[in-house]
UniProtKB/Swiss-Prot annotation:
This is 2-isopropylmalate synthase. The gene is leuA. Its EC number is 2.3.3.13. Signal peptide: none annotated. Catalyzes the condensation of the acetyl group of acetyl-CoA with 3-methyl-2-oxobutanoate (2-ketoisovalerate) to form 3-carboxy-3-hydroxy-4-methylpentanoate (2-isopropylmalate). Homodimer. Residues 5-268 form the Pyruvate carboxyltransferase domain. Residues 394-512 are annotated as: Regulatory domain. GO terms for biological process: L-leucine biosynthetic process. It holds the Pfam family HMGL-like. Mn(2+) binds at D14, H202, H204, N239.
Length: 512
């Protein structure tokens, strides 16, 4: 029987560290449910000690998800570890993930600790955590750039104190596949008790090799856990992409010889959900989940695929969730058809009340555009008004007037803590006028650093999906809004971003 490769998803923790990718508790919970449907083995739900918001999100996910192991990150100190354990109390399967830097550069410049102090803190923290939960992961931050002799000592001590998983991060994406694979192999050979723990890889994509490095760590190094994110989401150039590493191992089972527990047919739904929640669009030619991933433009290729798909396709599109038969809904579609399509798309709403609310919004949209595509439905249920989070600001209605040669004017009605507010302003265009009207009342002081519009489907009556990125006091958030009217979508996106600025407490930055 082949070994199993453990898939550790850190979209909700490391992925969220991408500037602007912050998520609300309910958004995280919705994605966690999709990850459970995808059958990932471990979900790193957050960094419980970093903020009350992260603690609440970890606790909510731990109390809801039953199949996957739920993990919280923690620094190597008693306070962080105790906070993580508290957040994980409701979990069916709990893991605490402890990290401390071990490279000379990080120890000297960041921690201001000696190697001896780092070694002592490592073993003490694992010992403390082991008394709280049985499943402990230990990560020597910047492990790939650490002195091998010192790193072996730290890892040996961590395993001796009860660490069940040893994760070796390439924190800054410096590794090369062959070198990284040999590095993992060397550590496993030199650490005397290496067989007492599962070895894991965590690679960043700064040189574009996160997936290749992770696979080298598995094949050459003997790692049996890969840490990754949906769409490769993560700070800087991102993390190892879950969908790519999973399909590489599945498609080339002849080479890797490993089993996976992943339900790959739910990959596309997970990708779309993360993209629409964070506002980070998936590039068209992205492997596995990009819109062109299974498209053939060359006449020769098209002819070959029509005769036999395996002439130019190494995997089946439907195996990752693409469907050749798209069900198009419309205004005559009933609640049962809508609910069934939600299930097929991997969307789970908590209650009948939420389904009713989503269906009402679906019918409202169907009155405005004749055909409702999958992308429309996903955008609709990703809207924060369905998420259930407490919002300080909410969109009600908008009127805008624009005429050639005259300055556009907008009047908008929105709620502030449940009370209707009316505002109006002029601007350089209808979007500018609408957002100025909002800002004239809320006085957020935030700077807009990104405004982008994407058509959700391909026709002129398509919904527009707007992403607004705001920066204030060093914090960056993305807001996403969708509507057939781009001006309305822009206002919704702006409110979404404002709510995140209000709701998100400052966080402790974590690396890994």
């Amino acid at each position: 029987m082949a070994d199993k490769l453990i898939i550790f998803d850190t979209t909700l923790r490391d992925g969220e560290q991408s500037p602007g990718a912050s998520m609300t508790k309910d958004e995280k919970l919705r994605i966690a449910r999709q990850l459970e449907r995808l059958k990932v083995d471990v979900i790193e739900a957050g960094f419980a000690a970093s903020s009350n918001g992260d603690f609440d999100a970890v606790r909510a996910i731990a109390s809801t998800i039953r199949e996957a192991t739920i993990c919280s990150l923690a620094r190597a100190n008693d306070r962080d570890i105790a906070r993580a354990a508290q957040a994980l109390e409701g979990a069916a399967n709990a893991r605490i993930h402890i990290f401390i830097a071990t490279s000379a550069l990080h120890m000297e410049k960041k921690l201001r600790m000696t190697p001896g102090q780092v070694l002592e803190q490592s073993l003490q923290s694992v010992r403390f955590a082991r008394n709280l939960v049985a499943d402990i992961e230990f990560s020597p931050e910047d492990g790939y750039r650490s002195d091998p002799d010192f790193l072996c000592r730290v890892i040996e001590a961590a395993i001796a104190e009860g660490a069940t998983t040893i994760n070796v991060p390439d924190t800054v994406g410096y590794a090369i596949p062959e070198l990284y694979g040999n590095f993992i192999k060397m550590l496993r050979e030199r650490v005397p008790n290496s067989d007492k723990a599962i070895w894991s890889v965590h690679c960043h994509n700064d040189l574009g090799m996160a997936v290749a490095n992770s696979l080298a760590g598995v094949k050459m190094g003997g790692a049996r856990q890969v840490e990754c994110t949906i769409n490769g989401l993560g700070e800087r150039a991102g993390n190892c992409s879950l969908e790519e590493v999973v399909m590489a191992v599945k498609t080339r089972r002849d080479y890797f010889g490993l089993d996976l527990g992943i339900a790959t047919q739910h990959i596309l739904a997970a990708s779309r959900m993360v993209s629409q929640t964070t506002g980070f669009a998936v590039q068209l030619n992205k492997a596995i989940v990009g819109a062109n991933a299974f498209a053939h433009a060359s006449g020769i290729h098209q002819d070959g695929v029509l005769k036999a798909r395996d002439t130019y396709e190494i995997m089946r599109a439907q195996d990752v969730g693409w469907s050749a038969n798209k069900m198009v809904l419309g205004k005559l579609s009933g609640r049962s058809a809508f609910k069934q399509r939600l299930q097929e798309l991997g969307v789970s709403l908590d209650s009948e009340a939420e389904i009713n609310l989503a269906f009402a919004r679906f019918k409202e949209l169907a009155d405005r555009k004749s055909e409702i595509f999958d992308e429309d439905i996903l955008a609709l249920v990703s809207d924060e008004s369905v998420s259930g989070d407490n919002e300080q600001y909410g969109f009600v209605s908008l009127f805008q007037q624009s005429e050639t040669g005259k300055q556009p004017h907008a009047r908008i009605v929105f709620t502030v803590n449940g009370q209707n507010v009316h505002a109006e302003a002029q601007g350089n265009g209808p979007v500018d006028a609408s957002l100025k009207a909002i800002e004239a009342h809320v006085h957020s002081g935030a700077e807009m650093v990104l405004y982008s519009v994407n058509a959700i489907s391909g026709s002129t009556e398509s919904q527009g999906e707007v992403t607004v990125r705001l920066q204030n006091s060093g914090r960056i958030v993305n807001g996403v809004g969708a509507d057939p009217d781009i001006v309305v979508a822009s206002a919704k996106a702006y409110f979404s971003a404002l709510n995140k600025l209000q709701n998100k407490a400052d966080r402790v930055a974590a690396q890994g």
